[in-house]
């Protein structure tokens, strides 16, 4: 009986903490004239976890998002993750428009290429990033067939919200795979093909800047 009461007390405390956190966030956003953020669905997060094997770190986490992602580690509130190194298998889902998402994407790619992280899944609702950041095409990318209904936190839990923008999911597979390892790119394809089209061309993995240099040299006529 005491254990049950203790558990109920913890659940009530956790709910109140979530409500306080959400109210604080709402107040900050209201002061800046912004809306409450939307969060990725558990279905996407679990697919990413299955592909990577774990979610060791979420640099874009906040107290609400951590309820959904349940990453092994999240940054403390005073840490600017754009200036710190990350680790392990990383889930990245930045909030905001193209400018903010491109900052997070560039940071993710930099951490990945320099070996600080093993792999990543990057979820973004700024679909304009497909044009603004050509580096995306160096990696497997899933473009959902339908706009993903994301979640907004309320005092009574999460509510599903129909978005006004398209989404994308980008995958950075482990760079140190051996012949005995599972083909992670195929796993990503199999896990997300029921969500959208997975695109990965034969030149993916090359640095897109090489093609840009080639263009500057040749200036193909159109």
Task: Describe the residue ranges of each PLM region.
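Class I S-adenosyl-L-methionine-dependent methyltransferase catalytic core
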Residues: 2-222
